[in-house]
Amino acid sequence: MTPRSIRMAGFIAGFFVVVFWAAPGATTSATLVPHRGIYSIGLERAEAGSGVVGVEGAMIYKFTEGCDGWTVENQTLMRFDYEEGRSLDSSWSYVSWESKDGLRYRFRVNQTRNGKPGEMFRGTATTPGDGGAGQAHFSQPSRFEVTLPPGTVFPTRHLLALIEAGRSGGLNFNRFMFDGTSPDNPYEVNAVITPLRGAVSGQAAKGPLPEFQLHIQYRDDGIAEALLQDYGDITLKLHLSKVEALSRPEC
């Protein structure tokens, strides 16, 4: 089994999300708190055939706000321990900037494995603002373009819309989202929202299986307190161990 990347506000793959929301029924508009969070990473579960016996690591997630956009920085370090004593060190970094009007997006992704360069993606994306199709331009690892389906949004606006759905009592949320973390973008994200941990119905089993399932426990200010990433053969757990509020700009 190869190492997986932990991605927040840089979600991957046409996947299924279960959101545990702290404050359904709120009437004010969703806002995100600029912050820097440190998450511990560990192995929640591993099937016998996965070959994985242990995972440990940390993720540093930084969300900042400017007058015209948001910046997300994610740096993840993980060590995978395998049967027969093998191990692998993996690092993954992601930096993005997204305009508040939802029209422009820049991204940069780097991965290393045992210190050797791995995947690298860089590029920009735009949407027309009228709900029509957008366009993504990758400059690395090679130059190519991807058409974004009508209604595609970028990560921060996707998170804001997800929070709005949770606060208004919505139970299901489905939308295309582009984050630039792989050439397979954009991804169709299917979310089920519940105010109670563990109160998940059997809906996840219907239809095509997603690449993985992501369970997120959010605070009312949009900060994730705990996450589970279930890839089928292994499940990784993340817990918020430290959070620091950051200032907002005076615009």
Language model region names:
Residues 74-126:
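Hydrophobic/aromatic-rich structural module bridging two neighboring secondary-structure elements via a short loop
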Residues 108-251:
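Mature, soluble, non-transmembrane domains
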Residues 62-66, 97-99, 126, 217-219:
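Short beta-strand micro-motifs enriched in acidic
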Residues 31-40, 68-73, 102-108, 188-191, ...:
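Short, hydrophobic/aromatic-rich segments at coil-to-beta transitions
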Residues 1-6:
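N-terminal secretory signal peptides that target proteins for export/translocation
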Residues 25-87:
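N-terminal cleavable signal peptides for secretion/export
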Residues 10-21:
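Bacterial N-terminal signal peptides
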